[in-house]
Amino acid sequence: MQASKALLAALALGITGLAQAADEVVVYSSRIDELIKPVFDAYTSKTGVKVKFITDKEAPLMARIKAEGANTPADLLLTVDAGNLWQAEQMGLLQPFKSATIERNIPSQYRSSTDSWTGLSLRARTIVYSTERVKPEELSTYEALADKQWEGRLCLRTAKKVYNQSLTGTLIETHGAQKTEEILQGWVNNLATDVFADDNAVIQAVDAGQCDVGIVNTYYYGRLHKQNPNLRVKLFWPNQADRGVHVNLSGIGLTRHAPHPEAAKALVEWMTGPDAQALFAGINQEFPANPQVAPSAEVASWGSFKADSIPVEVAGKRQAEAIRLMDRAGWN
């Protein structure tokens, strides 16, 4: 009888331990603390589930998950750009997770076709222009920035960044390799300066008069404009008469060996819902991936636009080809 009681007590302790372990989720994130902590704190306040997170660049995080294998503590990988999420999927780091809630909240073009990841927020990679030297009616499409009109007037970020690789991937999907290479060559020919390390530098160069136009992610513009409302730079939405603006995302995927898959899935479902979408997108100065949720007042002030309907995972599928074409065009 005493032995039975001892066994029952041990089992109870074991079950309690499992329940406590399931009351936390571990996220590896390439987004910095200040952009994610308020969201995870809100989830903990609502559910009692603790969200632990580690931040780093996407490549080291993916290498870490791969090295940890079945012993990884990571339940979720949160990163920027569909190209990175697609890469993680190809490396075997993620597993599919079906969810009617996520399917209802997030359009299919912003989710993996294998259900391994979903978008959480959207950013447009669009044109910025000098309000002093360019009239908006002079602008039209990404492709038109290759025209002679813009010779010595264009600024770009390095081709090494996945954001430009993804934009190029969608150009390949739209135009094919030959036409895309011609466009890229035109951009390179029109450069006013060497390429920059980041989008902030592109915007600042346009403001300073080093160049007249550039291509950047919208949230960089949002951050700089917040710091300096007198910025002499504005956004322009290209390709409104055809396919629309190139849109990419921040997204999240369930790791292959997630210790708490159900708890992780519940967190992702909540993050695609109205409250979390407004909070996450607002902090990041991005657009909610859930179309039922309005963007922040600041983001809404940039105006509405037609977005490219190409599934964002195309950016990953075309990534290797995009890098080859960028290299051949001399975009370094």
From Swiss-Prot:
UniProt-listed Pfam families: SBP_bac_8
UniProt key word Chloroplast: no
Query: Matching InterPro entries, A to Z?
Result: Ferric-bd (IPR026045), SBP (IPR006059)
Please provide the record's keywords in A-Z order.
Signal
Q: Which residues form the signal peptide?
A: 1-21
- Has the keyword Secreted been applied to this entry? no
Q: Which domain of life is it from?
A: Bacteria
Family, as annotated: Belongs to the bacterial solute-binding protein 1 family.
Q: What is the designated name of this protein?
A: Probable binding protein component of ABC iron transporter PA5217
Lineage start: Bacteria, Pseudomonadati, Pseudomonadota, Gammaproteobacteria, Pseudomonadales
